[in-house]
Design a protein with these regions (language model features):
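Short, low-complexity disordered leader/linker segments with a strong preference
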Residues: 1-34
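Sec/Tat-exported extracytoplasmic proteins
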Residues: 39-45, 59-60, 64-67, 96-99, ...
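Signal peptide-proximal N-terminal region
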Residues: 53-76
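Short, well-structured alpha-helical segments in soluble
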Residues: 77-78, 82-102
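Extracytoplasmic ligand/sensor domains, especially the bilobed periplasmic-binding protein
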Residues: 100-148
Length: 148
């Protein structure tokens, strides 16, 4: 399976998870559903980050045009980690503490995911990664999933 196809499938899976999580939220939240996206938008992995951004944007645009999730639009908040673990940690902290997201799609670099998942877990934030392949991520958190 090509890397680009994995990103596309990963984006679809995260959107499905957003729908599931949002459907089970109590009490009802008003306003957009904020979803963080950490990707290498610059640096050595920028081409993958750009593809991931385009795929996620198209998927969310389609969902929002069809009424969003339970009538709420999805709003994406992007952070560039440049495939650098320290920048992944900073990005995760910003998404949690400033943007107040409860779901993060971390698209590529295993080292960044390994560094940032513990922060997300401590804060009750779900993380999905479409490319993290490190064996160190197996059973790392009940709030972490990867695929396909």
């Amino acid at each position: 399976m090509s890397r680009n196809l994995k990103i596309a499938i990963g984006a679809i899976i995260i959107i499905a998870l957003i729908i599931i999580i949002s459907t089970n939220q109590k009490p009802k939240v008003t306003g957009p559903i904020l979803v963080g996206v950490i990707a290498p938008m610059s640096g050595p992995g920028a081409s993958l980050g750009e593809f991931a951004k385009n795929t996620v944007d198209m998927t969310v645009e389609k969902i929002n045009k069809e009424g969003g999730v339970n009538g709420q639009p999805i709003q994406l908040v992007y952070e560039d980690d440049q495939c650098d673990p320290a920048k992944s940690v900073s990005a995760m902290q910003k998404l949690i503490n400033v943007d107040r997201v409860k779901i993060v799609l971390e698209t590529t670099c295993s080292s960044g995911v390994i560094s940032s998942v513990p922060i997300a877990t401590q804060n009750g934030v779900f993380v999905f990664s479409s490319f993290a392949t490190s064996g160190n991520l197996k059973n790392v958190s009940p709030l972490f999933a990867r695929g396909p």
